[in-house]
């Protein structure tokens, strides 16, 4: 690994619904601590909480911190940390952990991405050659699962247990939660099993991601599956594999895939910013995060 100017590398992925932290040993690149938590629209409080917990676990250690994610940049500025684009953080993690990957499918709280990788012809390094992202509607994302779970009156955490028992697949729109509701409500009225609706929702997500995002580009294996919705819903991964026609050996679900991008951000502290001094300090960052919302107004 790169020479480190701090004791630990820390990556924070601030998304639309969750905050993820990854603490990495600079000498090995191994994950020492991680956490994935919903922020319930209180991003600053959750970022502060996760950083304080990490400092409590590693007292006296200096942190080099890099933020990524849709909400990461203002926190990087407030805490005098580094900022890295999410797709770059993803590529760093893929390069370090699973360089055989050709395509990564990542589902977040309110976005979905398909990232295509290839070898740089000059350096031979794995790079992200193309990325497709929905970014407009929550269809085909974790929020879509939340919406369907609410319609079924089941907890999001229990959704997988319903889907894995589903037997029959019905046509449900994965493009939008509003359209999905018009498909699902009549099914409920007709007595269709919740298990079948949950499974059908996973098929809708996979169909939307493969057809809507890839837009004709071939998804070649090995394919990596990342993000909370794919980590906590193994049936969703199975559905993707079925629709892509790939085997278990051609599918990669990385260790701790729910914080995989945060892991990449942590690696960036050394691999991309190693020659720069990180200005992050525990006390100064705590004060900045405590008053984050006031300063942003």
Question: What is the meaning of each model-derived region?
Answer:
Residues 2-28, 101-121, 168:
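Gly/Thr-rich phosphate-binding beta-strand-loop-beta motif of the actin/hexokinase/Hsp70
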Residues 6-46, 127-135:
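Short glycine-rich, Thr/Ser-proximal phosphate-binding strand/loop in the N-terminal lobe
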Residues 36-39, 54-88, 115-116:
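Short beta-strand-loop/turn "lid" adjacent to the catalytic site in phosphate-handling enzymes
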Residues 71, 217-243, 254-258:
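Glycine-rich phosphate-binding loops at beta-strand->alpha-helix junctions
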Residues 83-87, 240-263:
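Conserved phosphate-binding/catalytic loops in two-lobed NTP-binding clefts
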Residues 119, 127-168, 267-271:
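Glycine-rich phosphate-binding loop plus the immediately following alpha-helix
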Residues 142-147, 253-295:
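Glycine-rich phosphate-binding/hydrolytic loop that grips phosphoryl groups
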Residues 180-215:
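Adenine-nucleotide phosphate-binding core of ATP-dependent small-molecule kinases
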């Amino acid at each position: 690994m790169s020479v480190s100017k701090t004791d630990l590398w820390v990556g924070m992925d601030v998304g639309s619904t969750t905050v993820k932290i990854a603490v990495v040993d600079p000498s090995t690149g191994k994950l020492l601590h991680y956490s994935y938590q919903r922020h319930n629209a209180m991003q600053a409080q959750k970022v502060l909480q996760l950083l304080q917990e990490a400092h409590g676990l590693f007292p006296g250690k200096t942190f080099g911190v890099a933020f990524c994610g849709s909400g990461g940049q203002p926190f990087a500025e407030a805490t005098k940390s580094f900022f890295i684009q999410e797709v770059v953080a993803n590529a760093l993690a893929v390069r370090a952990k699973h360089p055989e990957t050709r395509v990564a499918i990542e589902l977040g709280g309110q976005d979905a991405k398909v990232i295509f990788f290839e070898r740089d012809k000059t350096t031979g390094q794995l790079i992200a050659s193309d990325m497709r992202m929905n970014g407009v509607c929550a269809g085909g994302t974790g929020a879509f699962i939340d919406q369907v779970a609410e319609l079924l009156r089941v907890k999001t955490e229990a959704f997988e247990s319903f889907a894995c028992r589903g037997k029959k697949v019905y046509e449900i729109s994965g493009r939008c939660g509003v359209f999905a509701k018009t498909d699902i409500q009549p099914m409920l009225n007709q007595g269709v099993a919740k298990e079948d609706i949950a499974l059908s929702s996973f098929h809708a997500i996979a169909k939307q991601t493969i057809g809507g995002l890839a837009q004709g580009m071939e998804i070649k294996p090995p394919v990596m599956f990342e993000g909370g919705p794919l980590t906590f819903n193994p049936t969703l991964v199975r559905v993707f594999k079925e629709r892509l026609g790939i085997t278990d050996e051609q599918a990669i679900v990385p260790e701790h895939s729910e914080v995989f991008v945060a892991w990449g951000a942590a690696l960036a502290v050394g691999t991309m910013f190693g020659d720069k001094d990180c200005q992050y300090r525990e006390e100064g960052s705590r004060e900045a995060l405590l008053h984050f919302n006031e300063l942003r107004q």
